């Protein structure tokens, strides 16, 4: 039977939902999210306030009753219990011992045996208390190096003495005092559209975890959850036969997201993008690729992050003039493994949407602009699914994940008919809407359709909020459709002035899955990856075997051992000739060269 227990402490009143057959451990797990301490050996529970009791029986610690059920403790719906503890108790997970020291002066909660004497923890051996990570600091996960680097910085923005200052060189006033990285005026003055992820994180940390409350911790990041709880235990039938305020999602108000997980997309060399676009130039069909690169610090935005693209891998696909279809990609684990050996990972996707203008001057049609759309509704949903598949790992969320650093880049026509890349992400709200199956595409590319209710989906009230021409906030109903721009976050993109790409072979290798380019052509073999193309690449480049597509092809051949493949990747990454000499002396490399000689 479901019931509610009430707890009163010096930090406030708490309500906990449970049932009579659950152990007190489930109650403590919920209390741990609200209490400023996790040392359960020092927290006493009583049915009288201030540890005062006429019967003279002893209070019990939370630790001593963890394994007893609610019915064994003779607790009823609505019972009020009092918690006593000290804020000076150190934080940390506590391992329980076989007995606990009890404080006197409070009446004990009745156990099944009715005894009010000293209690002991059940079990002869020590056990560890299950404590929510939010009670004692960030969770322990492996973040990206760039996140660890930015975590160690405060991001404070220094300002020089200005003409408004009326003090000496060692003074400070409101015109020259440092600013936090999320300062709104700084963002507007420097034309920064969104604050960075780590600036937003610092802002949330300052809001939820104040220094004077160092004994408590609240995870500052949380992904929105818009799905109904199909396993609600509030005593009603499961949805759709029953519903309550606890299991249904709250009303949703969509706003333009104020922060972005990645601020900038940089292609390490213009040839990376140029080679990708050449498919459209040759055939007129569209193309899709995965961006492999790394994340680095971006100095033009406070605490900013940029994704640096070193290679575009084109998976199996069926391309058409106005779209494409992705096919099964069986080699994805191999490609990811080679990228990891090189210090790279998937950072996003890229696809073309190009139509020749017909002017015979190399210009293309401009189809994406403020009066049409930037990403279509289906592309927004696709981007959200990719972001969900590639979450951002962070220690500042209870589940260790918050949104994503995965980028979506579309290559289309600019306002002057030029070919240009445009990079986007979708908001964390978009990810939540897609997870809950609330949105889908519509016949208008710029509009997103809101689904209706069904047996597994409950759609709450949804509104979107925008600022009108008078500077006032206006809310509109999002049903049945709403503009897709409310789910978009735009990035900047560029090429470096002084490019230093990782892959610098003199002659590029054949790019995968482009066999159709040579159809009906006497040079068709130039678009095939085979033993002949591998041997030709080695002959033309000598020792400069610095090409991602060639590395992946060699790995798929399965001739080199794991150690030899790692050595080859190390040589490509660090470009130390000693590693190349060591590779040449290995048995697998000699076998590899022998096979190439015999097959060509």
From Swiss-Prot:
Residues 109-128 have a biased composition (Low complexity). One of its GO terms (molecular function) is ubiquitin binding. GO terms for cellular component: Cdc48p-Npl4p-Vms1p AAA ATPase complex; Doa10p ubiquitin ligase complex; Hrd1p ubiquitin ligase ERAD-L complex; nuclear membrane; perinuclear region of cytoplasm; replisome; RQC complex; VCP-NPL4-UFD1 AAA ATPase complex. It holds the Pfam family NPL4. Residues 109-140 are annotated as: Disordered. GO terms for biological process: cytoplasm protein quality control by the ubiquitin-proteasome system; DNA replication termination; endosome to plasma membrane protein transport; mitochondria-associated ubiquitin-dependent protein catabolic process; mitotic spindle disassembly; mRNA transport; nonfunctional rRNA decay; positive regulation of protein localization to nucleus. Belongs to the NPL4 family. Signal peptide: none annotated. Transmembrane segments: none annotated. Keywords: Cytoplasm, Endoplasmic reticulum, Membrane, mRNA transport, Nucleus, Protein transport, Translocation, Transport. This is Nuclear protein localization protein 4.
């Amino acid at each position: 039977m479901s019931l509610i227990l009430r707890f009163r402490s010096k930090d406030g009143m708490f309500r906990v939902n449970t049932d009579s057959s659950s152990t007190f451990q489930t109650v403590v797990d919920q209390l741990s999210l609200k209490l400023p301490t996790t040392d359960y050996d020092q927290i006493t529970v009583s049915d009288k306030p201030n540890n005062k009791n006429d019967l003279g029986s002893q209070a019990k610690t939370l630790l001593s009753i963890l394994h007893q059920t609610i019915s064994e403790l003779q607790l009823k719906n609505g019972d009020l219990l009092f918690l006593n503890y000290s804020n000076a108790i150190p934080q940390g997970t506590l391992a329980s011992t076989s007995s606990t020291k009890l404080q006197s002066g409070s009446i004990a909660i009745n156990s099944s045996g009715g005894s009010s004497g000293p209690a002991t923890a059940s079990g002869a051996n020590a056990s560890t208390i299950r404590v929510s990570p939010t009670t004692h600091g960030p969770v322990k996960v492996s973040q990206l190096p760039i996140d660890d680097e930015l975590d160690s910085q405060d991001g404070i923005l220094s300002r020089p003495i200005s003409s408004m200052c009326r003090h000496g060189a060692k003074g400070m006033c409101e015109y020259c005092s440092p600013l936090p990285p999320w300062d709104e005026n700084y963002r507007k003055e420097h034309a920064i559209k969104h604050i960075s992820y780590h600036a937003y994180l610092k802002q949330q940390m300052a809001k939820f975890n104040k220094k004077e409350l160092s004994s408590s911790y609240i995870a500052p990041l949380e992904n929105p959850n818009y799905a109904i709880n199909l396993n609600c235990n509030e005593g009603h039938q499961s949805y759709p036969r029953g519903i309550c305020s606890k299991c249904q999602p709250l009303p949703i108000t969509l706003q333009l997201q104020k922060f972005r997980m990645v601020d900038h997309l940089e292609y390490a060399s213009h040839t990376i993008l140029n080679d990708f676009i050449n498919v459209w130039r040759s055939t007129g069909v569209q193309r899709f690729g995965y961006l492999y690169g790394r994340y680095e610090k971006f100095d033009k935005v406070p605490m900013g992050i940029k994704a640096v693209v070193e290679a575009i891998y084109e998976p199996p696909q069926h391309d058409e003039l106005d779209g494409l279809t992705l096919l099964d990609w069986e080699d994805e684990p191999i490609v990811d493994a080679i990228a990891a050996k090189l210090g790279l990972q998937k950072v996003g996707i890229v696809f073309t949407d190009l139509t020749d203008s017909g002017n015979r001057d190399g210009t293309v049609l401009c189809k994406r602009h403020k009066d049409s759309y930037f990403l279509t509704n289906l592309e927004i949903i696709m981007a959200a699914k990719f972001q969900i598949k590639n979450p951002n790992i962070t220690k500042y969320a209870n589940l260790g994940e918050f949104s994503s650093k995965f980028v979506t880049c579309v290559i289309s026509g600019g306002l002057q008919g030029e070919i240009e890349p445009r990079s986007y992400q979708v908001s964390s709200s978009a990810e939540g809407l897609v997870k809950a199956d609330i949105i889908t595409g519509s016949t208008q590319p710029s509009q997103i359709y809101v689904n209706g209710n069904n047996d597994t989906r409950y759609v709450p009230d949804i509104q979107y909020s925008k600022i009108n021409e008078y500077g006032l906030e206006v809310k509109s109903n999002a049903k049945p459709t709403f503009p897709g721009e409310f789910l978009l976050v735009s990035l900047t993109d560029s090429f470096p002035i002084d490019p230093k790409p990782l892959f610098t072979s003199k002659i590029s290798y054949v790019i995968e899955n482009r066999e159709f380019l040579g159809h009906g052509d006497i040079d068709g073999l130039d678009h095939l990856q085979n033993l002949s193309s591998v041997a030709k690449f080695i002959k033309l480049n000598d020792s400069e075997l610095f090409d991602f597509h060639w590395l992946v092809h060699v790995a798929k051949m399965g001739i080199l051992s794991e150690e030899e493949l790692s050595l080859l990747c190390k040589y490509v990454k660090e470009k130390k000739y000693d590693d190349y000499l060591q590779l040449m002396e290995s048995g697998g490399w000699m076998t590899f060269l022998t096979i190439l000689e015999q097959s060509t």
